Amino acid sequence: VRTVRPSAALVTTFANCMLNATSCTISKLAVRTDPSRLRKVECMEKAGATGAGMGTSIQRIRWRIEGIVQGVGFRPFVATIARRAGLVGFCGNDEQGVFIEVEGPPDALAALRSQLFTELPALARIINHSAEHIATLGHEREFTIVPSRHSYSGRALLPPDTALCPDCRREFFDPTNPRYLYPFISCTNCGPRLSIITELPYDRPRTTMAAFPMCTPCEREYTDPTDRRYHAQPISCFDCGPRLSWHDAGGTATATSREEVLALFRRAHALLDDGALLAVKGIGGFHLVCDATNDAACEKLRMRKRRPDKPLAVMAPTVDTAAQLVELTEQEKRFLDSPEAPIVIAPKQRSGPLSNLIAPGLDSFGIMLPYSGIHLLLCDCPLVVTSGNLSGEPVCTDNADALKKLGHIADAFILHDREIHVPVEDSVFIGTAPSRRSRGFAPVPVSITPTDSRSHTGPGPGTSARSTSQPTIFATGGELKNTFAIAHGDLAHVSAHIGDMGSWASQKAFQRAVDQLLSMRDATPELVVCDLHPDYATTAFAERFAAEHDIELLAVQHHFAHALSLLAEHRLLSPNAGRAVVATLDGTGYGTDGSIWGGEVLTLSRSSANWERTWHCPTFPLVGGDRAVTHPWRLALGLTHAWELHDDHLVRNLSNEREVALVKSQLATGVGTVQTSSLGRIFDAAAALLLPRWRGGGAISYEAQATMELEAAATRYVRSHAEALGAVSSETKPVPFQDVIREAVASPDAEQAAFVFHGGVAGVVAKRLVQAAEEAGTDVVGVSGGCANNALLMELLRREVAAEGITLLQHQIVPPGDGGLSLGQAVAGRLLAATGMDV
């Protein structure tokens, strides 16, 4: 096992590591290429064209298109524009993407070329393309879509599941349309993709829709090039599609016709009005649902699911309804109603109809909109819509499994008979910043080629779907909020959210997802990368995988991976680049010294794997290991002891006298303690010191609960004191963390104390970042780690850094927490490969 440690571990340059994009025969384009780039491409193609057919009035071109071009209406789009231009030939799917052969006059071919890259279907993305002139055939009479080919190269990209498009929504509510109120309505521009694909290339027989033969009207649409459902693989209707069914203590009823479906949902609405809990099978998994305005229903859900405090997501019927429940910016409204349709965490409205049990102790919660026909039928008022799973396990996807596991929670079930092949949970964003990347986003790959720009949302120019010059890397991710990643060619394929790895069910789901993505990519890893922590389930998996496949294993320090994930998504890693400074702030990460890190400033080379820990938060002891993490008062005792905050008022009534005495004795001897520099744990300790809620020995019931409640208290202060955000620290040097605590404790009330603490922390971290950046001679400064989910802390930190003339880089594509860790691990693997190790 190799481990990546600071400075001396990896010092070779980045050359030969990040891809130089040489695999494309002629050119590489991003979706919606600008006209100047397109003209350059046309000249390149004309200059490089060879072979029979040149110099004649009729030419034939063979195109290879790679990217998200399967399951998004790309072949029908090509056929339509080719026929419109009077061209003949064919196109089809294979494991690489889409192949096209087209024949006709040069002017018509030029028109096709222009439209091919500027008028793409809504969900399509071209990552790479090549073109060559070949011999004309002369006998074709039309342009056709041909059956898929099997080449087993694994270059086609999997499309994500997306929300209903505007056209399907209009049809859904149109009483004259055959699909009026049809639960499974979709077209080439929307609906399930990843969740139903069993293998590539993407055709109906290779999806879970294969179990539903098309009726004559659906087949007519499917084969009509002018129809929006031309080659739409999920196409179905009341006559031929999946069927809903109702299950409760009274028995089972199947709903086939529109009338039966309406009766089923009337029954569901009646139960919800009475405070019942429903388990509903959606597109990518099950949801547990109840009336969001009903205290008794919300309390029942929390009790049965054993989720006493963790915030619940709410589904609102419309954007306007959502805006009555939470405060939304115009950008957030558009995001909610986008094809990705994520859950958006936003501040609560000051008054509203929702139960206070939605997000106890917090001032914000997640809001979402209906994104499928099933949800449109169900959601006629605000509903709690939370993952249908047992605590600590992945979301249920199988009917029998759900009936077994959720039977003690739900009063009734709405099921359907379309198999969910790949679980896909809802994505979560804090405003427009990623917190959980899943439905609508995964597995859209992340480009890991360098660029001069610092703002990217996905693969861009100069990327290819595969390069033979780079080793394939499998990164197993972290223990919490797990994703894994496969670096394959120029792209990193980060999986959909899997979740916490503590249960056997989660580990089995992880194994299935790994097998599926490796198979879809036709990828054979040459190196496996894991976290440095020896006790993670993902570390054990990586060890077994490396042994079974006889490949080398690399263990990467947690916070180095966080920092790399930020730089990689901004595509700032490149040969001859300078250095970067990244604050990695979270709850826990196994340090190279055996202690628990989580409040670090790292200085990294952007052209090699060299890094160093420039600064860290002052350490203090965790007393009792994991028990300390769940009991903020224990953290507070350890912090005040180590930081010499000798004030009896600070620690008064933290817990009962017996427990406090026991912890103090452990602090005196050091027995049963471990040192930490974690900012997340400092926030937990501060919550116990500043919020009455956390005095008295209470334990958190979900990760980061005390920290989130501290943020909520500080945010309430900001909402009632708008001028508070305008102030920036006047200190020219970082103040000691002890002074931050003292100043916060001296505040007149808990909300102001929480805000003062946030401001003090932001000031200290910002000064350390700027200081490290000056020493490194760089203006590339960023932040990663789970604490970056604290929106108030990030805004204060951004303002502090901006006051020094520096723009703070934050995550835009992958989550700053452990959901983005696998991307950083994969990039670390590429760095190691660049040192010349034989992989």
Locate each region found by the language model:
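Low-acidity, Ser/Thr- and Arg-rich intrinsically disordered low-complexity segments
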Residues: R2-A8, T12-K28, R32, S36-R39
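Intrinsically disordered, low-complexity, mixed-charge
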Residues: R37-P234, F238-S245
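Active-site-adjacent structural elements in enzyme catalytic cores
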Residues: V146-G458, A465-V529, H533-E548
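A contiguous, well-structured pocket-lining segment that forms one wall/lid of small-molecule binding clefts
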Residues: P234, G241-R243, G478-Q516, G638-T778, ...
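Conserved phosphate/anionic-ligand binding catalytic regions in large, soluble enzymes, centered on
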Residues: L278-A292, L383-P394, G587-I596, G670-L691, ...
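Glycine-rich phosphate-binding loop of actin/hexokinase-like ATP-binding domains
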Residues: D426-D452, R579-H641, V663-E711
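Glycine-rich phosphate-binding/hydrolytic loop that grips phosphoryl groups
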Residues: H559-L572, R579-L585, G591, P632-H641, ...
